[in-house]
Swiss-Prot record:
One of its GO terms (biological process) is D-galacturonate catabolic process. Pathway: Carbohydrate metabolism; pentose and glucuronate interconversion. It catalyses: D-glucuronate = D-fructuronate; aldehydo-D-galacturonate = keto-D-tagaturonate. Pfam families: UxaC (PF02614). Keywords: Isomerase. It comes from the Bacteria. This is Uronate isomerase. GO terms for molecular function: glucuronate isomerase activity. The gene is uxaC.
Length: 467
């Protein structure tokens, strides 16, 4: 019987252990997509206790607590922090089999060094006091944790109207050498169907100092914001796409009419929504290509399913799930529309429904280009798939349908400074898979060859890709 979470956690063969400890473990973290608050990095937030650093904004943990029957006031409500922490401590033993159980114990080990204790209601008080003591120390501030976890870069997720004042402050601070760059997230600009679209266009116009009343003026405003983001080191643009729409792009006059209808609060048809979003996304893609940015498409979530809780808590509170809309043909035509003019940017495709893994695994091969290794990527297991089984599926299907050796690897996609252990989780799973190939005679026992592949996937490929 193996002990719980030893140094060889998830590594069942000697080859896997060598690959992880000799090649993967010490690689820096290039976290190219996350939802950290740049203000907390700029101000080097010092968290007071484990409730703050663990439970604020972490909808993974919130969902688990709700599933365990915890009352909402102990999750997102008015209860004191220690009571919320104890409610989580009571939930964790019920999470065996869920990735939260592994993540929680990995987060205790790194960065806190708590390796000899299983988190439970019985150990909660001891761990609370230990965590509180450590969190008062400078090396456990937001920046301190990033340094302890060997983070090289983080890419935050930012709206085009953001001033990027905190990114500017971080870049000008010579005492901090972790690169913190913005990522351009224009969802509210291309989703013309959103209820608050008109309000957003007004805000965008003010920030860009342009009155947006035509499609060309909208492009001008977004172009100015792209230049603003580029100035502060932006390397990527991210897009959340519940639905992948495609329609042949109409002439500018038709696009102006669609925009005017929407700005005048007139109803627009589904075909008009598709025409508008296609036109704007294709144009945005060519802009990203011009600036050498990476385009990321996160596809397939159903968001804000619970109307009552959405009204109470707003978005991103743990009430989203996996969608099942088909999108292969529309995605292919969208990418092809950019590629026809040789202006398709480097692109990472993520699906929330694992049913679509093989489809994306083959889709990326349609648009690869000489001179850019792995130009089009099948992204790491996202959201409900960034757990052991989901990561294994994505890695296996990418290796079978594409080139695993060119993969840009893991990202946290998280709002928590403790989520860097997800890179460790991924690296262990990667090394276990490759080590298993060697043990079964499916790959050569060449640690130089495989070790370089592991290092590339863990760090070097992403470092080269996002430049």
């Amino acid at each position: 019987m193996m002990k719980f979470m030893t140094e060889d956690f998830l590594l069942s063969t000697s080859t896997a252990q060598k690959l992880y400890h000799d090649y993967a473990e010490e690689q820096p973290i290039f976290d190219y997509h996350c939802h950290l608050n740049p203000k907390e990095i700029a101000e080097n937030r010092q968290f007071n206790d484990l409730a703050e650093i663990w439970l604020e904004g972490d909808h993974y943990k919130w969902r688990a607590m709700r599933s365990a029957g915890v009352e909402e006031h102990l999750i997102t409500g008015s209860a004191d922090k220690y009571s919320k922490y104890l409610a989580f401590a009571n939930t964790v033993p019920k999470c065996i089999g869920n990735p939260i159980y592994h993540w929680t114990h990995l987060e205790l080990r790194r960065p806190f060094g708590i390796t000899d204790t299983i988190f439970s209601p019985e150990t909660a008080e001891k761990i609370w006091h230990k965590g509180k003591e450590l969190l008062q120390q400078p090396e456990f501030s937001a920046r301190g944790i990033m340094k302890k976890m060997n983070v090289n870069l983080v890419g935050t997720t930012d709206d085009p109207i953001d001033s990027l004042e905190y990114h500017k402050a971080i870049a000008e601070d010579n005492t901090f050498d972790v690169e913190v760059v913005p990522s351009f997230r224009p969802d509210r600009a291309f989703k013309i169907e959103l209820p608050l679209f008109n309000d957003y266009i007004e805000q965008l116009g003010k920030v860009a100092d342009i009155e947006i009343n035509t499609f060309d003026k909208l492009k001008q405003a977004l172009s100015k914001r792209i230049e603003h983001f580029d100035k502060y080191g932006c390397k990527s643009a991210d897009h959340g796409m519940e639905i992948v729409r495609f329609s042949p792009i109409p002439d500018e006059k038709t696009l102006d009419q669609i925009l005017q209808k929407r700005l005048n609060n007139q109803p627009i048809e589904e075909e008009e929504i598709a025409q508008f979003s296609t036109a704007l996304l294709v144009w945005l893609g060519t802009e990203y290509h011009k600036h050498h940015w990476v385009m990321q498409l996160h596809i397939g979530a159903i968001r804000n399913n619970n109307t009552r809780m959405f009204k109470l808590l707003g978005a991103d509170a743990g009430f989203d799930s996996i969608g099942d809309r088909a999108f292969a043909e529309s995605l292919s035509r969208l990418l092809d529309s950019m590629d026809q003019t040789d202006q398709l940017p480097k692109t990472i495709l993520y699906c929330l429904n694992p049913r679509d893994n093989e489809m994306l695994g083959t889709m990326i091969g349609n648009f690869q280009t000489g001179g850019i290794a792995g130009k089009i990527q099948f992204g790491s297991g996202w959201w409900f798939n960034d757990q052991k089984d989901g990561m294994e599926r994505q890695l296996q299907q990418l290796s079978q349908l594409g080139l695993l050796s060119q993969f840009v690897g893991m990202l946290t996609d998280s709002r928590s400074f403790l989520s860097y252990t997800r890179h460790e989780y991924f690296r262990r799973i990667l090394c276990e898979m490759i080590g298993g190939w060697v043990e079964r005679g499916e790959a050569p026992n060449d640690l130089n060859l495989l070790g370089k592949m592991v290092k590339d996937i863990c760090y070097d490929n992403a470092k080269r890709y996002f430049k």
